[in-house]
Amino acid sequence: GGGLGIPYFPGDVPVDLPKVGAALAERVANLPSQLAETELCMELGRYLVGEAGVYLTRVIDRKVSHGVTFLVTDGGLHHQLAASGNFGTVVRRNYPSAIATRFGAEASEEVNIVGCLCTPLDRLADNAMMPRAEVGDLVAVFCAGAY
């Protein structure tokens, strides 16, 4: 199942577990007698580990095309399908990400972080403000613990 979500993007709020628990307790307490022995299970994988993982990929090329800067990485959708926006999302949004080898640097340029596959779907971040990155730098994509 879909499980419980995590706050991936600005404005997302964490699941209110006490509220969910109270609602479930109310529903379970009112089950018909035929369902009294029913076991209810929840899939909690994303909720438990989603924020715990960081996907790292290395910049292998830096190029500018028609005034747009692209950081080409050795990873991408073939490693991190969810962050590429190709995992059942209707609207693609950037996962939280950073230039891991330049954490202390100020975000100074807008870049598109892309994977190495020959498809326009292989994108990890669009129009993201990042410190200037060079070939060899590491890109970190956060909230990568699930999928």
Model-flagged regions — what are they?
Residues 1-42:
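Acidic, glycine-rich loop-and-beta core segments that form the ion-binding/anion-interacting portion
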Residues 37-147:
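Charged (often Lys/Glu-rich) extended helix/loop segments that serve as interaction or gating elements
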